[in-house]
A protein has these predicted regions:
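Short phosphate-binding loop-to-helix
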Residues: 1-2
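Anionic-ligand-binding alpha/beta catalytic cores of soluble enzymes and soluble regulatory domains
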Residues: 6-56
Length: 143
């Protein structure tokens, strides 16, 4: 039996139905024991936090961060290190109360939930690194 430390979904495209389904799959109950569940979609980063759980992110100061309850209600949602802190609030599904927050000057954001599945979108996270390219072949030296 496998026990991964992380699952990362990488995808994109212009089909909204595919986007919603793929991102939604990260909230599957079978993934709740995996310590880190995240994804890259069209160059934007997201994390999925299964409750009860905590997540700390280091993000560029003043960048945008959104908390969205995509999979049902989330209870006891707290966030600090942002312009607008939340302290143990309940988020209803797909309600914009957690949308468009701003990372504080320190760049460290702490998120905690008591129950539910919370999706965290952080659009300003750098794109994933590209695989290294092959070095050019050595050139001959003529003396």
């Amino acid at each position: 039996e496998m026990h991964p430390a992380r699952i990362t979904l990488v995808g994109g495209g212009n089909r909204l139905d595919h986007s919603i389904t793929a991102i939604g799959a990260l909230g599957h109950r079978g993934l709740m024991l995996i310590p880190r569940v995240d994804g890259w979609w069209n160059g934007e980063h997201l994390d999925v936090l299964h409750g009860p759980g905590e997540l700390q992110l280091t993000l560029p100061p003043a960048s945008t961060l959104s908390l969205v309850a995509l999979h049902g209600p989330c209870a006891g949602v707290s966030i600090s290190g942002t312009r607008w802190a939340l302290d143990s609030v309940d988020l209803a599904p797909l309600v914009g109360w957690g949308v468009s927050n701003e990372v504080g000057p320190g760049g460290v954001v702490s998120i905690r939930i008591s129950a539910g599945i919370l999706t965290i979108f952080n659009a300003s996270t750098p794109t994933p690194p590209t695989p290294p390219t092959e070095p050019p072949p050595p050139t001959e030296s003529h003396s």
